[in-house]
Amino acid sequence: MQPALRNQQSAGTIDELRALNARFIHNFVTSDVASHDAILHPCFINIWPTGQRWDRATYLKYWATAFDPDVIVYWDVRDELITVVGDVALVRSTNKHTRRRDGNEVTGMTMYTDTYLFENGAWKCIQAQLTAVAPEHYPADDTIVSVYIAGKLQARAK
């Protein structure tokens, strides 16, 4: 007998995953390793745009110091798309980032797909995969979900 699958696209499930996505990003910007560790599956793997794979321990070590607000002066989340199929969820978004190096600012975008598994009553991220985005495929500003400037979450206009 198969276990019953969750209501795939219920508003509650989507809201829960949207909140996890916001927490995932906030954990990165604030270097909150403990909070981030709590949402990762024990078998978590990270896949970089280069194809390099990092296990959970390597990823969390990197996570502790990866965001420097003096270098990453702008960060946003945009074009969020969440799909749920049974006990698996794909959380996709794009980050726009502006990095300051040697007095120059360089802006780019990276798309990510975080794969969540619903297990033991909770969603846990089992894989995060990053993909560089070519300028001709940049999502529009009207899809922005959240903005961080110098590591501080900005209030959204209503």
Regions found by a protein language model. Give the residues of each.
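A beta-strand edge to alpha-helix "cap/lid" segment located at domain peripheries
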Residues: M1-A38, I45-K158
